Curated annotation (Swiss-Prot):
Region annotation (Interaction with RBM14) ranges: 1-1018
Protein name: SCL-interrupting locus protein
Sequence positions bearing Phosphoserine: 395, 753, 779, 1135
Phenotype upon changing residue 64 to A: Reduced centriole localization. Does not fully rescue the centriole duplication defect in STIL depleted cells
Annotated segments matching region Disordered: 378-417, 508-533
Region called PIN1-binding, residue ranges: 584-779
Source species taxonomy: Eukaryota, Metazoa, Chordata, Craniata, Vertebrata
Function per UniProt: Immediate-early gene. Plays an important role in embryonic development as well as in cellular growth and proliferation; its long-term silencing affects cell survival and cell cycle distribution as well as decreases CDK1 activity correlated with reduced phosphorylation of CDK1. Plays a role as a positive regulator of the sonic hedgehog pathway, acting downstream of PTCH1. Plays an important role in the regulation of centriole duplication. Required for the onset of procentriole formation and proper mitotic progression.
Keyword Ubl conjugation tagged: yes
Biased composition (Polar residues): 517-529
Sequence positions bearing N-acetylmethionine: 1
Native source species: Homo sapiens (Human)
Gene Ontology CC annotation, any one: cytosol
Amino acid sequence: MEPIYPFARPQMNTRFPSSRMVPFHFPPSKCALWNPTPTGDFIYLHLSYYRNPKLVVTEKTIRLAYRHAKQNKKNSSCFLLGSLTADEDEEGVTLTVDRFDPGREVPECLEITPTASLPGDFLIPCKVHTQELCSREMIVHSVDDFSSALKALQCHICSKDSLDCGKLLSLRVHITSRESLDSVEFDLHWAAVTLANNFKCTPVKPIPIIPTALARNLSSNLNISQVQGTYKYGYLTMDETRKLLLLLESDPKVYSLPLVGIWLSGITHIYSPQVWACCLRYIFNSSVQERVFSESGNFIIVLYSMTHKEPEFYECFPCDGKIPDFRFQLLTSKETLHLFKNVEPPDKNPIRCELSAESQNAETEFFSKASKNFSIKRSSQKLSSGKMPIHDHDSGVEDEDFSPRPIPSPHPVSQKISKIQPSVPELSLVLDGNFIESNPLPTPLEMVNNENPPLINHLEHLKPLQPQLYDEKHSPEVEAGEPSLRGIPNQLNQDKPALLRHCKVRQPPAYKKGNPHTRNSIKPSSHNGPSHDIFEKLQTVSAGNVQNEEYPIRPSTLNSRQSSLAPQSQPHDFVFSPHNSGRPMELQIPTPPLPSYCSTNVCRCCQHHSHIQYSPLNSWQGANTVGSIQDVQSEALQKHSLFHPSGCPALYCNAFCSSSSPIALRPQGDMGSCSPHSNIEPSPVARPPSHMDLCNPQPCTVCMHTPKTESDNGMMGLSPDAYRFLTEQDRQLRLLQAQIQRLLEAQSLMPCSPKTTAVEDTVQAGRQMELVSVEAQSSPGLHMRKGVSIAVSTGASLFWNAAGEDQEPDSQMKQDDTKISSEDMNFSVDINNEVTSLPGSASSLKAVDIPSFEESNIAVEEEFNQPLSVSNSSLVVRKEPDVPVFFPSGQLAESVSMCLQTGPTGGASNNSETSEEPKIEHVMQPLLHQPSDNQKIYQDLLGQVNHLLNSSSKETEQPSTKAVIISHECTRTQNVYHTKKKTHHSRLVDKDCVLNATLKQLRSLGVKIDSPTKVKKNAHNVDHASVLACISPEAVISGLNCMSFANVGMSGLSPNGVDLSMEANAIALKYLNENQLSQLSVTRSNQNNCDPFSLLHINTDRSTVGLSLISPNNMSFATKKYMKRYGLLQSSDNSEDEEEPPDNADSKSEYLLNQNLRSIPEQLGGQKEPSKNDHEIINCSNCESVGTNADTPVLRNITNEVLQTKAKQQLTEKPAFLVKNLKPSPAVNLRTGKAEFTQHPEKENEGDITIFPESLQPSETLKQMNSMNSVGTFLDVKRLRQLPKLF
């Protein structure tokens, strides 16, 4: 019978020394009851000390609650049911919400009560809002809710009910829904109240235990907790010998004996939440008459751990002192959930979120005041009544018999709670009745409400505020400091961080959990919290029909694409006072102060409208994936130059917007051309209007005064005139939009707001939107364009470095870069319209270290003939036939080529391209109208060069490279011009002047190229190019010239040069047969002996190499089809089938050489007379080009006979031009060692490719070009076979 003694009170009482038969005495001295020497480190105990409580909610539960609310046609209350469990590692708790209870009405209760709650159920009162737009910063708890929750916590801790951790967390949720055609978006606002008291535990030496049946049971393998499958706890007392006596929790003697601590069983770790709960019960149990603490205020915990045979002993110290009082904590969470209506809810992927105590918002203020009132009341109760509450005495203690016995314990508590919680119905009633006019709000809120009367109905966070107003008048608690609306406006105006949390607007879990840092970054300006919400809501209401139609995208983006900076989370960011002027949190970087006139012109209310206008897009779309604050700022500056033409100068508007206007962030999502979602939106022109409000003073007066007069008329109470004001505001918004649109149209051609042009260029809008949206994101990765431009115009984003890497401040560089990129835009737009235009330089626009953007184009163009006008220029040509085909303006040719030079070569401007990508489009338009200005381009180039010189390292090895390349580019450019348009000969002469001056200046400057940063960027470029090579050979090849190819090959010629690129090798292994590989290996063995002349000859032969490499015979049908479809292979004469993406470097180099050959065909004779510098690759390139001169410089299309003949004709027709263009090239010295733009192993792409087969004579070039099997000295087969295959 002994094992059951612990369970049977009669036996226990007779056996225990504490029974009546054997008197039990506590040690007469209460000092030194145990040895307090610590044996380990201390540990803190609290529910959320190690980990925030986690919520796991099933989707079906939310759907059921939503359906129930819709059926009831009102904001109905209901219950969600779940269970609270400790995590496996016992460091936190998880609340699983998986059931729905509509509740039932009870006559004597104002609120519904649970239909049938079972023991262990975690009850969550829930309110679902389906008919109104609620504020993201809604206050879930009313004052009554807080009061009842605190009382419930106190009752449970102080009572003798069985301890339930779930009762120590009082949770409520408000759900707001927004419905679209096929989906519903829910905002879940969770708020939980728990105790903040924590404990500090320190392990101590073992204390002897009286070996009672209970003690033996707990030490055995099958103890109570294991048998019952749950943890058990009880109390500790001591006998005269200072041995511990274990008592069950239900033992009546617990309440009459002095207690020294608690024991627990069935728990693994001391930091388990159950231990914390038991400590709270021990400290606050009102039935315990005497607790004996050590001299330092500690009590004992004996833990029978599941992993230890012997019990563990701890000293536990209440961090609040020996006589602690209740401290409470508010935990909140906000989640956004996007569900499709007709999709079966998956139970496998529940919604997960965390309850955290970090946020400081209006609800936190209410809570702190409610908790203070509660503590005041409790202390007064203690003073007035010496007895403990009657309801706590329902166990068998004898002195209880003298007091009336209440209803059994668990139920009275819950029933009391329900009676104490009439707040939800009352709250909804107050809100439904709109504002209580008798309680005027502070001025800031008045302004908000006056401006946006309808909002008040829809702002959920105002709802909680209303009860406070009500309570302020009617509840005594308020007098003691109950939260009221007054606190909120003050917070708004003072930069109180308390409201900061408001700025976390409906952020999806990814944002909240993934980027805690970002979340913190928002805090600094929280003062604007709720107010901006109000305006955002207003916008959604008043301008809903305008905006909502424009932005159909909203439904599903929030969860998937929340930006790390979460611009959309800033909608509340709006202002009540000038110093708060809606500055987005992300842009809180030090920013230039607003010019005084700017601030005066910017009307706050209009500002609100503008924010509101876009907030629906941003907050719903979640589209602004901004890579970095830098990018955001730069983009914002660019974008805002056009939004504020009327109010203040564009320049200052830029500064203003980037620094203080939330719009500064939004336009990324708003502007069609710059937003990832832009292509979905109707037109970029439709959106800017709202931004104009910022600087448009006239609308401001309208907005300001109308509401004010109305506010004087009592609008604070939202009188029946509310809807009239709403319609008035709607009208004003439409008026503003119309004005803004007119302003934009008027401003579209102004250079000060280049972006406008892009906006207005609706013809190109579709394509450009795609391009810029890819480029404007500062992602360095390969953004394949959609549609035709996938392979053709990928050049722009493929070869640009990430914007954030090293953005060049130099505006001129940016201009040139944007010019280039604008060409790319034109091309990509054209490619759709002009099937014949083959991928030109645009596709390889930023090709790696391929300097001659223009040259490559020439080669391509020459091959494809003038009718096929280079893809780049196609658009330009149509628009401005007088301008040379390639460039929107005559100057652009050189500026672009040189810009490319400084860009890919120096690498630096590439970055600036990205940072300024948003300007791409705008620059394009102005360029079309700009007259050629040689001096301007010259200065631009010099600016770039100087900048590069400043940022480059001291490597003097490569001074002439840039000059040479530039000269080549320009030469080729001129060739293009001559070949394409004789009428522009005079222009070319001008260009020569500019070119010569530029080269002279470059030489005098001693241009240096390969700084480490540039090397890095070049490496980046080459990586991109190598990827592109597989997609479009011309995208890479057309961008190569003899110079860049020579630079590629030179590394192989120089003894310390890097050998073959892995990619080139892999591709060669894939596409070349054994004979070809063996030829390559043999020819390469002679490579090192080549002198410049032999190099030249090899050069000429190089053209044949590409034939076999590119041959479509080695391609899959899908690849050939793809290449044909996008104009990467020619369909005429099956020449397309002959051309194939070879390896990046090979094809590039050969193509370049061919181009060079073509461009320099007249120097056939000089082919064997390269420049006097044997080392000069330029000579090689010239010679190679010369070599090709006799032969057609056509791309090595085996069957490309027609094109070859065309090219021949072109060359023969205009040999003078070509020769003339070539002349500058040999003059420039490009030493072999210095031409290695890609000196880096990563750039091996162009590593050891010997470009110039020495064995071939120039005259043989054509023959070999036509012979498909000929392979030049190109690759080292031995090395090839040693390297791993990449495909």
